[in-house]
Structures are given as structure tokens and as C-alpha cells.
Amino acid sequence: MSKSGNGNGDKVLYCSFCGKSQHEVKKLIAGPSVFVCDECVELCNDIIREETHETHEETEARLPTPKEISNFLDEYVIGQQHAKKVLSVAVYNHYKRLQHKSEDGVELGKSNILLIGPTGSGKTLLAQTLARILNVPFAMADATTLTEAGYVGEDVENIIQKLLQKCDYDVDKAQQGIVYIDEIDKISRKSDNPSITRDVSGEGVQQALLKLIEGTVASVPPQGGRKHPQQEFLQVDTSNILFICGGAFAGLDKVIRERSDKSSIGFSAQLKSKKSSNDEASKVLGQLESDDLIKYGLIPEFVGRLPVVTTLQELDEAALIDILTRPKNALTKQFQSLFKMEGSELEFRDEALIAIAKKALERKMGARGLRSILENILLDTMYDLPSLEGVNKIVIDESVVNGLSKPILIYEQDEKKSASGSKD
């Protein structure tokens, strides 16, 4: 749209949408027989952004089913099928409880989770992967660093601060997050009898965690912490935060055996004891009861706040080999991607994978030991490779894993020679 101006042949242009002249706006963009001003462009952008945000929120609101959660866990975590099933159902019920507030007056309790399993069995990875599929903030804490308020160490409220940091201090998001507390077995009290002296890193921490896990309004310093004391503390309601606690609980199988042995008396008790002593620890853990955890050193109130308990099996050689190769972000795939950036292909032979798994089993580190083994094997190659030219492939075999030889480097000219030789 245009209009004659001052009679000198100048034309005043107008926005085809809002009708404002070129003098009333900052910018007028021309199209085929139409004009649009910068204000209308900004308005259109706002409308599109708002609609996109609403669509995104609708997508996020859809809660995956337990089977979908378990299938997603399968992509990243090898084995532990029973633990995956228990976690999938518990997490689904927890977030379903948040989405559908009870209309019949029945209050649904929160089902926090306790994961029991040896080091490197996948406890932390399961919790991290759950947070990823649900697209909620996730924070990790180490129970061994926690102390009662007023003592040297981390207060339990610091856990909530970590969760807030993960979501840019959005309180609403944090209140629906997941917190994983590792090494929870390390805060077991030192004896069955309540101690007269303060146990600030054991029973004291359990007492401090009680309300936080059950649900309370925690006061957390805002962004910047104590540097700005005049700022008001953020109030975070923890009643909808899902707490997952994990620990190795070394020796718990002995506690279970002792209880089961006492269930019989006389000659039959001795027979049962002999039989149970030959059982694998993982099978014994399947008979776990709440009293066993209390006997181990967790206070009854704390055990009561963790109603969902599941055990993870110790990983065998086959599972460790699968962990090296099968998941989306498998360790071998990560290193292959790293070497690809240098223009080289990294190949692990089957016997090398078996040798790596055996080393991890010897170290009793489970899946956690795999990365350090691979780092040691590939250290020299990663050091030299950026300085070398024409290396097409690096091959890792059993002798390399056992330190008897160096990785096999295949150069570009070697491949060309072998290719021409095969033609002849």
C-alpha cells in the first residue's frame, strides 16, 4: 500500500498489516505488492513462540508407560531386568500421582526407592537415565559428604540447591525433579544400640534426611548463596521430589543369612546354614526384609521412607562385554568416535573384549572399571596419533590388553599395497 506525500513525487509507504506509515516504524520490509513493519514481524514471532511453547508443554506432559520407560532403560543399561521393572513402575506411579491429583480425597503416598547392588552394577546410570527419559532435573549427592547442620561438611539442604542449579533456579521444575543419593549404606549407624555420643555422619545424617525425603519445605539460598545475605531464601517443597538412594551394602547378605539361620533351631539350623553359605550373595539379597536393613544400621524411620527396594545383580563377563559394545553410548563406540575425529578407525577384536571384561572382574569394579582399563590401553596411541600421518586403522587384540604388545597401526599405503596385491 502506498500514498502520495508532499507533491514532489515522494510516496509514503504503509504496512499492509497494521496500516502504520514508514515514519511511524523502525523498518518496513517490502514484498510483492505488500509491506510489513518490524512491529508486525515481532508480533508474529511472539505468536509462533507461544504456540510452540504450548505444544512443547503438551508433549512434555505425556507420561511414558512402564514398558516404554523400561525399553528406554534397555538402550543405555545392560541387564538388571527386575530392577528396571521395579523402577519403571515406581517412577510411573510417582509422576502419575503428580499429574492426576486425587479427586476422591485419597492421598497417594510417595514411593521413594532404595537400590542395593555392588559397585559398578548400574545404580547411578539407572537413576540418570530415568531423569533423561522424563525430562526432569536430576541431582546427585554423595551421602559420605553429608553431616548434620552445624557440623563441618555438607548440609542435607545442599542437595536441593544442586537440584535448583540444574534447572536455573526454577523452583516449580525442581519440585518435580529426581535426587539420587549414592553411598547411602555408608551412613548406617555404627552399632544396633543408639549411641550416647553424636554420630554426625551416620545416624545423625539419616535423621536429617528423614524430613527431606518424606516431604518438607526446605529453605535454600538463592543464586549467589551467602554472598548476598539480604536476599530472601527460596522455599522448595520436597514432597513431590523423587528420592532414589543407592548403596553396595557390603555384608548385608551375612545379615540376611543370620536371620534365616535363626528361623530354625537344632540340627536343621546347621543344615540350613551350610546350605545358605554356599548360596551366591545376589540370591540371598532376594530374601531381603526391612528388619535386615535396620540390623545393618539404617534407622527404622529411614527404612520406612524408602518403601520400594530392589537389588541389582553383580555383572558377569558376558554382561560386561555387552556393556562395552551394545548401549547407544557404549564405551567402545565413544572411543571409536574419538579416533574418528583423527581420521582413524578403531577396531576391537572379540578376544580383546573378553580380556577387558576379565580384567574388570578381577578388579571387582564392575562396569565402572571398564573405562579406566580402556584409557590405559589406548593412552600411548592417543598420545602419538595426532602426530602421525596416514594411520587408517588401529587394531586392539588380546595381547594389547594384556600388555604384551602395542596396538596394531595400519597405514594408508599398507592398505593400498594389500589392495593392489589382491588385484594381481
From Swiss-Prot:
GO terms for biological process: cell division; proteolysis involved in protein catabolic process. GO terms for cellular component: HslUV protease complex. CDD domains: RecA-like_ClpX (cd19497). It comes from the Bacteria. Pfam families: AAA_2, ClpB_D2-small, zf-C4_ClpX. ATP binds at P118, T119, G120, S121, G122, K123, T124, L125. Residues 1-56 form the ClpX-type ZB domain. Coiled coil: none annotated. Zn(2+) binds at C15, C18, C37, C40. One of its GO terms (molecular function) is protein dimerization activity. Keywords: ATP-binding, Chaperone, Metal-binding, Nucleotide-binding, Zinc. InterPro entries: AAA+_ATPase, ATP-dep_Clp_protease_ClpX, ATPase_AAA_core, Clp_ATPase_C, Clp_protease_ATP-bd_su_ClpX, ClpX_bact, P-loop_NTPase, Znf_CppX_C4. ATP-dependent specificity component of the Clp protease. It directs the protease to specific substrates. Can perform chaperone functions in the absence of ClpP. PANTHER family: ATP-DEPENDENT CLP PROTEASE ATP-BINDING SUBUNIT CLPX-LIKE, MITOCHONDRIAL, ATP-DEPENDENT CLP PROTEASE ATP-BINDING SUBUNIT CLPX-LIKE, MITOCHONDRIAL-RELATED. Component of the ClpX-ClpP complex. Forms a hexameric ring that, in the presence of ATP, binds to fourteen ClpP subunits assembled into a disk-like structure with a central cavity, resembling the structure of eukaryotic proteasomes. Belongs to the ClpX chaperone family. This is ATP-dependent Clp protease ATP-binding subunit ClpX. It comes from Legionella pneumophila (strain Paris).
